[in-house]
Amino acid sequence: MICLRRRSDGLPVVWVEAVMIIGFYYTYTATRAVADGSVPAALAVGWDLVRIQADLHLNAERGLNHWLQGIPVLAVASCYYYATLHFIVTPAVLVWLYRKRPGHYLRARWTILCATVISLVGFILLPTAPPRLLPGAGFVDTMASFHDWGWWGGGSSAAPRGLAGLANQFAAMPSLHCAWALWCGWCVARFARHRWVRTLAVIYPGTTAFVVMATANHYVLDVVAGWVALGLGALLTAAVTRVAHRRGRRDGRADPVDQRAGPQRAGQQAQPAAIVGTAAAHPPASTNIHRTRPGPTRCM
């Protein structure tokens, strides 16, 4: 893997991460131009998914959608969940890994980036209309129904009012919400110290899957495809890590992706030398016991 600049502990500096994230955002925005010219194809794919899921007895979205519409409090909470956590939890986990678990940051970051690239390719090659945009399919657009309760507009999913043009309405396959949620849950469940935090991490991916389907933003197969995209991203990152590790050993340098052997192991390797140097400079007092004579005993 290529890093333009690194800190002394092997992590890329913050500005490199910021440039990368901004670049991916504009790449996602560019997919809208491709999707806008494929509305009939996107609707056709949506209907195909409905028929395929019916044959597989996987059409759970409509029932969840109608059930959620009957509970306004839960529907509004689901709208806020969909419109916020996707954009808050994922960056928060990235920052937490960068600051608190630096030895695992690079591999985790490359995993989610690879999964995002795979998803972007899916958006371009297979524009898919979400259930809420299928006319006559019996779905209710939950976000539009409760748009007065939030900042999102009635004509878009989670985009703020007046900014619907920035959202790709036909980026349903795969579900990036579910891919990112599973990544967050896996990272936090694996590396967090507190049990209650790990419990929330385990619940988060499943809750996200429920929300995206109940609000009629994704199909069951979208959710599965999002999880598969994350799995492929993890496999690709692992493969590149192994190749980079072999090259690093051959060239006599550290693995540029897997930085778990960074400052901590370096400190562990340097510790014996430090102990030897300290022992040489300050020999233990026990070596001079035979040279000292006991002083006079004073009784008080």
Predicted regions span which residues?
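N-terminal transmembrane-helix/juxtamembrane module of multi-pass inner/ER membrane proteins
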Residues: 3-88, 295
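Alpha-helical transmembrane segments of integral membrane proteins
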Residues: 12, 16, 20, 106-111, ...
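Alpha-helical transmembrane spans of integral membrane proteins, capturing the lipid-embedded, hydrophobic core
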Residues: 17-29, 87, 91, 112, ...
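Aromatic-anchored segments of alpha-helical transmembrane domains
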Residues: 26-30, 116-124, 203-214
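Membrane-interface loops
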Residues: 39-48, 98-197, 241-260, 272, ...
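Hydrophobic alpha-helical transmembrane segments
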Residues: 80-94, 176-185
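Interfacial helix-loop-helix junctions of multi-pass membrane proteins
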Residues: 127-137, 168-172, 206-233
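Hydrophobic alpha-helical segments of polytopic membrane proteins
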Residues: 199, 209, 228-244
